[in-house]
Amino acid sequence: MVIYTSKFKNSLLDGLGVGHLSYDDQPILCNEVHPTLTLDTFISGGSSGSRPRPRWVYLDISTTNEGISEEFSSNTESKSPLLKVCGVSSKSSEGDGSSFIWFDKYRSVISRLEHSGFVEVERTVLKLRKISKELRSINKQLSRLFLDDRERAKLLSRKRKYLDFARALIGSISKSLTLYADRFFVEVPQDYAKLIQKLGFSSDTLLLHLFVNSGVLEVFLDDNSSHKFRIAYISKVHAGKYHPVKGISKGSQEAKRVLRDLLVLSELLEGSLVSYRSGGVETIHHLIPVRHFVLTAPKELSFSIWASLKKGDSSLFRAFKDAGAKAIKEFLSYLASKEHISGNLLFGFTINVHVTGDKNPFEPHFHIDAIVTFICYDKSSTKWFRLNPLLSESDLKKLRDIWKNVLLSYFGELLSEDTKSKDFDVWAGDNYYSLPLDVPQVFFELKYASRKLFVNFVNYFEQSNFDESSVSDWDFVRFVFEYSNRTERYGFLTNIKRYLSMSCSHLVEKRVQELEEFISRIEFDLSVNGNKMSDSLKRALLERLEYLKDELSELKERGFEYLFERALEKAEELLSNDNLTLERVIHILETLFTALGKSIVNYNFYVELEDVSFREFVDYLYDNHLSDVLVFSDRHRSITIIRLIPPPDGGVPV
């Protein structure tokens, strides 16, 4: 049996001395009622009604899509049947209804479960950020000193709705097997396959093979209780070139590389980030803030860049990317000057140029997707500074002004007077993240920025039908499918080891002092109390002493190189697929427990099934006579929870 435990440091999931807890196997909600109310419904006061067609278009980012081959032959054989999405035949540009038989049955987790006899009975939308934000707002208002009885009763009524909903949903999860998956595993629109066919791509490009891990997740709460949940998730996947999972995997791989370096920075800069914004007094910070920005080109400019690319000229494209980097640097310099930080400053951020959007991926919509760290390095003083990530309305106006001025300086001659007279779009999100606390969230944002952009067509077909007569430029559509969406690093992110080595020599001295102090304490304890200790405790202290002495010797010999390698190894361990997936599941559960006034402080995951084919997983569901299955379809900002039940006769798994 494999056991995974929480590994992210400094977070609520660290484990705060919670051990030897007795747990209650009974769910919080002991009745047999499942939640039937969506958050949208109970917040607005409406009725749940029948299942609606999705009204949103937002890229969701998978946490488990490693091991994807660049091409996957349709002749690949496996000893066990696997989930297979064949799409439509590329031999005929027209095709017929029968071409979609395999696609309909095997294109997704939901279709496979339904084909195996499970019946969908309910959907619940869980908007994570909205819940957290609303609860914080309610609690803040309830803490006001002067609050009349009517206002208090109204706030408590709103809070009670969240509490009742959370209890019901936690109870449902406690009694079910929950399958967590990115939404591109869960459901893929049929019209996306029609587009693949129209473009003349082989059906092999929609191949999908899935493997599953399943086990028991035990979470420990801050009230000294614990709860168990049966959790499954996608552990491995092989996808064809144009399956949306493949598009997301590109983002996953790049996100891990960038996030690994950010975690190394957070590890080695802990306690070394300086700020002057508190009345001019120097303060020290431990966390690295990160924000997501989008800088959009005017429509007129987007079409000009595409026209240039279509002719084989990439000069406008390169200039647009340079303009984005310049605008971000100017804005960060402005923020630094506000906090009286000066010098030879170097900032750190990534940029992706997106050539189209989610709303209409069939036409050019060029924009800069930037993931920005709110720290900077002064090459003159070799100090690291933290910038305030809370942006005012005047800050956002400054960013819009900077973006417009930079674009006009680069492309003014190409733009009409009407375009020049308008504001240029800028998006800065509604929150920021802190590393190393918010690793899963930052991973999602990086993955979103680095994805293959043909994924946008999947988003589009969630709410729109394929109508080839409305497509005016098929060359652009093909360009989107082949576009690499390269992630560019800027500033200190181009070589973090170089800049850390220039500024962190004191870290070696600090760590040497810590190790020498630890060694001294253990040696003193052994000399004074060694005869009174149990054999097991004494043996443990001796082993720890030997380990610390080895580390001290290595540190004195190799210095900063040793510290950097240790931080790198730690970061890579944290970014394993299993850790990222489990931390995401914990984040979802944490949102529910927060509504109950509780918090998760630690967890263990006991693996029972490891890397089994999806067919074997379905057989497992039948063999264990599980009452129902909850599918958590992760959309990043929200979770669609789909409840399926097996047929009364037990069904025939296929």
From Swiss-Prot:
Q: Name one GO biological process term.
A: DNA replication
For this protein, the activity regulation entry reads: ATP and dATP inhibit nicking and closing while stimulating nucleotidyltransferase.
Q: List the EC numbers from the record.
A: 2.7.7.31, 3.1.21.-, 6.5.1.1
- State how activity varies with temperature: Optimum temperature is 105 degrees Celsius for ssDNA nicking, 75 degrees Celsius for nucleotidyltransferase activity on a ssDNA substrate. Optimum temperature for ssDNA closing is substrate dependent, being 55 and 75 degrees Celsius for the 2 substrates tested. Topoisomerase activity is only seen between 55 and 75 degrees Celsius.
Record PTM text = The N-terminus is blocked when overexpressed in E.coli.
The prosthetic group or cofactor this protein requires is:
Mn(2+)
Is the keyword DNA-binding assigned to this protein? yes
What name has this protein been given in UniProt? Replication initiator protein
What species was this sequence derived from?
Answer: Pyrococcus abyssi (strain GE5 / Orsay)
Family (UniProt): Belongs to the Gram-positive plasmids replication protein type 1 family.
Q: Which residues form the active site?
A: Y448 (o-(5'-phospho-dna)-tyrosine intermediate)
Cofactor comment:
DNA nicking and nucleotidyltransferase are strictly dependent on Mn(2+); Mg(2+) is able to substitute in DNA nicking 5X less efficiently.
Please list which residues make up the signal peptide: none
Q: Which UniProt keywords apply?
A: ATP-binding, Coiled coil, DNA replication, DNA-binding, Endonuclease, Hydrolase, Isomerase, Ligase, Nuclease, Nucleotide-binding, Plasmid, Plasmid copy control, Topoisomerase, Transferase
